[in-house]
Amino acid sequence: MNSLPESGSDGQSSADPSQKATSLPRYGRVIWILAGEASGDVIGARLMQALHAQDPSLVFAGVGGGRMEALGLHSLFPMSDLAVMGLVEVVPRLRQLSQRLLEAVQDIELRKPDLVVTIDSPGFTLRLLQKIERSGIKRVHYVAPQVWAWRENRVKEFPGLWDRLLCLLPFEPDWFAQRGLEGRFVGHPVLQSGVRQGNAQRFRLRHNIPAHAPVVILMPGSRRSEAPRLLPVFRKMLDILRVQYPDICPVIPVAPVIAPTIRQLIRKWPIQPHIVTDIHDKHDAFAAAQCALTKSGTSTLELAMGNVPMAVTYRVNPVTATIARRLIKVPHVAMVNLLAGREVVPELLQENCTPKKLAETVSKLLSDPQMVEKQRMAFADVLDKLSPPVGTPADAAAAEIMDLLNEPVSRSSRS
């Protein structure tokens, strides 16, 4: 399937909804869907395909990235406008984010969709759900806010925001139930990533990498504020590592939308990393890799799916870090470690995110088979916990959405 129907599209992704007619033509039931970052775009694309398989007459509108647009979605505005991380980093973007929120609300009011799906990005999506609370439109939030990790008091704001909450992690429904909210586990989308289909030899041949050269994956993040903080540290780390590993080959998989930014940031590196934007090439890179260094988040599960030994690192604005440490309630930031209940992969955060410490950790991953094997054994246990009861995660999420969509409006329950 190359394309899906899109409601009332005129091919203009950034038009002002307030300047259009007061209604748009409808060709079937409309689902308005919003993703705010690269991982949400992947989830959204798979969800669109699964929904279309269950009801081919569905049409889609909203905001998404390249993968959702490849299925026919004409994004209301660039998804990259919403991708921002950090309590301090968001401040310069507040005016733009407020404008995008207004545009999204106006578009929903104009289209009057049968259902709205918001994916992750709670800083933006939960405000959007609140703005349309009185519209009578059914609402689904996909990827439960991680309030179990930090700022638990936010849970008091959730009643009434959605009709259905779809959870990726198996412990989340119980956590929300204890606080009077219903969540439904649909499995983790990483299980559908296709990582295990990668081919190591194909990657080395395509990029002219010698068979003996160690391949190290570097994942600095998909948000504008992440890479500029991590990449300078990665560069200095590589300067240290190339003394011991002169043929080390760094690979940076990134979403196409931020590839130009990454290329600009690394243009003067003495060791030029391979920039990978194609999803299949990324999977081949994982297959070829000896280890990885990644920011925290879903990427840790993706690497675990690829059986790639890793360390997790992160660096944010010092003020953001100070505030976050007071609010975070969990012992680990890496999803692999959280699900394992122990530190499976090293976490080198903030002041521990230094070139020397990163180089020492990567060197261990390249030279210590026991460390590698312990990680890989833990990966298998963690991934077993992420499967939905039946089918794929996208199918399970689509089934929940279709169930709500088919309910009479009067029966839709507000959590």
Swiss-Prot record:
It comes from Gluconobacter oxydans (strain 621H). This is Lipid-A-disaccharide synthase. One of its GO terms (molecular function) is lipid-A-disaccharide synthase activity. Keywords: Glycosyltransferase, Lipid A biosynthesis, Lipid biosynthesis, Lipid metabolism, Transferase. It is an enzyme of class 2 (transferase). It catalyses: a lipid X + a UDP-2-N,3-O-bis[(3R)-3-hydroxyacyl]-alpha-D-glucosamine = a lipid A disaccharide + UDP + H(+). Condensation of UDP-2,3-diacylglucosamine and 2,3-diacylglucosamine-1-phosphate to form lipid A disaccharide, a precursor of lipid A, a phosphorylated glycolipid that anchors the lipopolysaccharide to the outer membrane of the cell. Its EC number is 2.4.1.182.
